[in-house]
Amino acid sequence: FPSSGLHSNGFSLVRKVFDFDKGGIDKTYDELGSTIGEALLTPTEIYVKPVLALAKEVKIKAVSHITGGGFYENIPRSLPEGITAVIEKKALKILPVFDIIEKTGNIPERDMFNTFNMGVGMSITVAPEDADRAVRILRESGTDAYIIGETASGEDGVKIC
């Protein structure tokens, strides 16, 4: 599921990047259509209803809420031992706010994926044969969803490629 923004995670780092005490949050960015401060205050998306609706139709194998710790800490906790999540970076819909944070703070990409949700608020793992159906069900119910990768046997963790 796409995120609506930071979802209240990574604000310690964001404070350093934008120097809140000196008005850094009042800068307007064309790609946001607002100030960075307004973008940071975007309310957190809640996923309970779409997850429950999907669970009635498709067997969900794992759910990962991408909170503090980003991809590298949250996704592995939801997967069985010996399984890795292979995430296709090009499949992600990274929100402009994350690009701005990364560039302004000169933050390495791995740190961004280890701190922020990068535009993915929640990941749901289903069997490969159920993936397209799960996306269709969610979209038909009014919730945007898209496939960001797959799971594979291997070391526990996340591989972003």
What are these regions (language model features)?
Residues 1-29:
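Phosphate/diphosphate-binding glycine-rich loops and adjacent basic-rich segments that engage nucleotide
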Residues 21-25, 30-41, 45-161:
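Glycine-/charge-enriched secondary-structure boundary and capping motifs
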